[in-house]
Amino acid sequence: MKGLLLIGIFMFCPVSILWGQDRIQQYAGTAMPYPVVKDSSGFFQDSMVPFYVNHLGRHGARFPTSGKALNRVKEILELARRENRLTSGGVTLLSTIQNLSETFDGQWGKLSVVGEEEQRGIARRMIERYPQLFSDSVKVQAIATYVPRCIHSMDAFLACMVEFNSSLHIQRNEGKQYNDCLLYTSDAA
């Protein structure tokens, strides 16, 4: 009986681990990278003609907003090292955390290079999929909250658009006055 129980547990483990990964992606919200949709053919039918795009996006990938959690783990690991209670895995983890702290120093909350590329990729795909909407000197209005990573995301997005069409008429705004219409928080995100 124990053998059957163990077999059942081991059979279920891989499924539960995979199920857990889906849950992480589902509930991680803005901590996950932007998904890239490769096939947009299902977005509209052949008889439909796009005439307007309204893109409401979040900032791209960023550095963590603070080092508090990282510092707390580092303090615990350093205490364990001083007391000679750190395993070889712990030594490796401490080294990794020290390297991360140095790498992130002065970068907390800032948009990362990956975040810039995410924004540029969204703009590029939009222009490639709907070129008729971005021809000539069409007007593009862009707004962002006052948060630097959001402004930087908007600028990366717009820079890519200008690379494709330098005659675009871009109206760019930023500030706290846009928070009510742009800043949305959710328990699920």
Give the location of each predicted region.
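N-terminal regions that are enriched for targeting/export leaders
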Residues: 21-110, 121-125
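Solvent-exposed loop/turn segments at secondary-structure junctions
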Residues: 60-63, 147-150, 177
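Extended hydrophobic secondary-structure segments that form protein cores and membrane-embedded regions
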Residues: 54-57, 139-146, 171-174
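Bacterial Sec-dependent N-terminal signal peptides
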Residues: 1-22
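Loop-to-helix element that buttresses phosphate recognition and phosphoryl-transfer chemistry
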Residues: 105-129, 142-144, 157
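Conserved small/polar residues in nucleotide/adenosyl-binding loops
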Residues: 184-189
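Short, solvent-exposed loop/turn and secondary-structure capping segments
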Residues: 65-69, 153-156, 167
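Extracellular/periplasmic catalytic domains that process cell-envelope and extracellular macromolecules
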Residues: 46-50, 135, 150
